[in-house]
Amino acid sequence: MVAFVDTGALIALSRPSDQYHARAKEIARRHKAAGGRYTSSALVLAEFHTHMLYLLGPAAARAKLGALLRDSTHEWHPATPDLLRMASERWLSRFADQRFSLTDAVSFELMSTESISHAFAFDRHFETAGFSLLA
């Protein structure tokens, strides 16, 4: 199964001090054992790198970014102008009462167009948008 991986899950896996670290490791272990793969967007990757940059410094952030980019179980989708437009029109407009970021909306649009039902995430925005979380 392919699951969408969100920034929070990537951070949790990378930081032993993160409140979700143990849970993230267990979810990732089960997903890998089942032959699972991940997909995500360049926006999520950029958010992750930014968090690592400020939490761990440039060298560690580059190393973690490089490891993700080399990992064959992860596929990264570019944030094309069409994808950004569709995400805004379909998700930010539809859920105007929610605090969804553009990154959230792009995530939902990718999941929708790629027929991905599950997200490896720790925020409930995915459930609000109609998707399931890996558990």
Task: Walk through the language-model features, giving the residues of each.
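Short, well-structured N-terminal submotif of metal-dependent ribonuclease cores
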Residues: 1-40, 53-66
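Acidic, PIN/NYN-like endoribonuclease modules and their adjacent C-terminal/linker elements
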Residues: 108-135
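Histidine- and aromatic-rich ligand-binding microenvironments
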Residues: 2-6, 40-41, 100-101, 123, ...
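Structured helix-beta-strand junction loops
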Residues: 34-35, 71-72, 129
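A generic structural signal for short hydrophobic patches within well-formed alpha-helices
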Residues: 10, 45, 126-127
